[in-house]
């Protein structure tokens, strides 16, 4: 719980109210965690969940993820994608930086190809496959 609210400004809530707020926020996005669990006792996936809850707690509307699945199992990746889809449905903009084309196609609406720091092309993923993306 402290990991989520540390550094926030404004009115401080009591621990019970804070716990309830974090649990409600987590439930609305499918981010179930144990608020009192210590970070050193968490899996990589749980730590990632805490980081996402942190930005949501602060009211962020844009989430930027750099290689978010690099150390996740396939099950953890699918869980993360479910969370991201729910966030998108609730109005969050999500930017994912990755080299995993199959994941790009499964989670995104559109993709921008970058080479040497320059934007090459942006395409809708609905009509794309991995081969087309590599040819851009």
Which positions does each model-derived feature cover?
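Glycine-rich phosphate-binding loops of nucleotide-dependent enzymes
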Residues: 1-136
């Amino acid at each position: 719980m402290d990991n989520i609210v540390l550094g926030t400004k404004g009115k401080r809530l009591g621990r019970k109210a804070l716990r309830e707020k974090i649990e409600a926020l987590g439930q609305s996005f499918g981010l179930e965690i144990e608020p009192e669990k210590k970070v050193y006792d968490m899996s990589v996936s749980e730590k990632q969940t805490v980081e996402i809850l942190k930005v949501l707690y602060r009211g962020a509307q844009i989430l930027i993820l750099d290689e978010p699945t690099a150390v996740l199992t396939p099950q953890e990746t699918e869980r993360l994608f479910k969370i991201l889809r729910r966030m998108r449905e609730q109005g969050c903009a999500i930017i994912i930086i990755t080299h995993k084309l199959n994941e790009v196609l499964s989670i995104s609406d559109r993709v921008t190809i970058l080479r040497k720091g320059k934007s090459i092309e942006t395409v809708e993923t609905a009509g794309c496959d991995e081969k087309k993306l590599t040819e851009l």
